[in-house]
UniProtKB/Swiss-Prot annotation:
The lineage of its organism: Eukaryota, Viridiplantae, Streptophyta, Embryophyta, Tracheophyta. It comes from Oryza sativa subsp. japonica. This is Probable protein phosphatase 2C 67. Its cofactor is Mg(2+); Mn(2+). It holds the Pfam family PP2C. GO terms for biological process: signal transduction.
């Protein structure tokens, strides 16, 4: 069966939407029977330029249909609190802009039905950002293969098992990195990519990251969590779900030194690379850089409204609470994940002068 190719639809209403009016084609790139929405290096550029900058930029966003399921699974949680509630659907979208860089090295995945060739009773959705450095090849490789490897490693498909899910994700990262290093050796390229990934399995969210890309959860502060995200009275707090991995941090520095590497006065591994965990980067793998992710999970409750995934470019100009407040305001105004994530990236690049590639994925929970 050939890869499916679909034209993305638009909710354009003028104004902000003109900034990203050229919508990309959507290509199923990871497996023959996989319905996947991914970033695409061949997207068109709209010709807009940054104020005060010479580099042209692009922003692309692909709408997804909500993944609807009446899952009744309940699981253990190491993050969540509050009353359990059935999560009926997940709506997600992504936006990107290359900023003042000449190339876009980020890649992202929107996979509202992530069961692939392993269907089961458990809802499975997957979303990710791979922030490339030194090129785009490592990010694209992870985009195409990491989720496949996680599925193959035994991601639960019938009954939720948090321990098994975490084990499968860690093994999927290991296998992806192993194969990526083989490919990069054959191709004589040295790209790397940090990663932040989310799997929605039934009522449970599992988050994995390696490097400095982040995931931030917006959770209601009300006692009962009944307030909708677009309720003017609803107050949300930002919960960072990931831990950055940088060579300058004491725990990572100690691990690097134990592996025979060093951290320079500039806080970089071997004086060259800031992150201490990433996929690829074969020249640093023998001196302490690893691809092992941190993995955390929580059970979704009515208090949990949305998750923002972002590369380091986004978080360089947005604090977690600031980003949650911005997205909440956009959802109050438009009730559209597509417009909210698009405006988030636009704000980061156009108004806050993000110089790096900027990519965000917005995942909205429907209760």
């Amino acid at each position: 069966m050939a890869h499916q190719k679909r034209e993305a639809t638009s909710d354009n209403g003028g104004g902000d939407e003109e900034w990203a009016s050229k919508r990309p084609k959507v290509v199923g790139a990871a497996a023959e029977k996989e319905h996947i929405l991914t970033s695409d290096a061949s997207h068109e550029t709209n010709g807009d330029e940054a104020q005060g900058g010479d580099a042209s930029r692009k922003e692309n966003t692909v709408s997804t249909n909500p993944c609807v399921s009446d899952e009744k699974a309940a699981t253990n949680s190491n993050v969540s609190s509050g009353h359990g509630v059935i999560l009926t659907s997940v709506e997600a979208d992504a936006a990107e802009d290359k900023g003042c860089r000449h190339t876009m090295e980020d890649a992202w995945v929107l996979l509202p039905d992530a069961s692939m060739e392993s269907p089961g009773n458990l809802r499975c959705a997957h979303f990710a950002i791979y922030d490339g450095h030194g090129g785009r090849l490592a990010a694209e490789y992870a985009q195409k293969h990491l989720h496949q490897n996680v599925i193959a490693a035994g991601l639960p498909r019938e009954l939720m098992d948090v321990k098994a899910a975490k084990k499968a994700i860690i093994e999927g990262f290991r296998r992806t990195d192993e194969c990526l290093l083989q490919e990069s050796t054959k191709g004589n390229w040295q790209d790397g990519a940090t990663a932040v990934c989310v799997w929605v399995l039934g009522q449970t969210v599992v988050v994995a990251n390696a490097g400095d890309a982040k995931a931030v959860l917006a959770r209601s502060t009300s006692a009962d969590g009944e307030g909708a995200v677009d309720d003017a009275k609803s107050q949300l707090k930002a919960i960072v779900l990931t831990r950055e991995h940088k060579a300058i941090f004491p725990q990572e520095r100690a691990r690097i030194q134990k592996a025979g590497g060093s951290v320079g006065p500039n806080g970089r591994l071997q004086g060259r690379i800031e992150v201490s965990r990433a996929l690829g980067d074969r020249q640093f793998k023998k001196v302490g850089l690893i691809a092992t992710p941190d993995v955390h999970s929580f059970e979704v409750t009515r208090k949990d409204h949305f998750i923002i995934l972002g590369c380091d470019g986004l978080w360089g100009v947005f604090g977690p609470g600031d980003a949650v407040e911005f997205v909440q305001n956009q959802l109050k105004e438009t009730s559209s994940a597509t417009l909210a994530v698009r405006r988030l990236v636009k704000e980061a690049v156009r108004e806050r002068r993000c110089k790096d590639n900027c990519t965000a994925v917005l995942i909205v929970f429907k209760h």
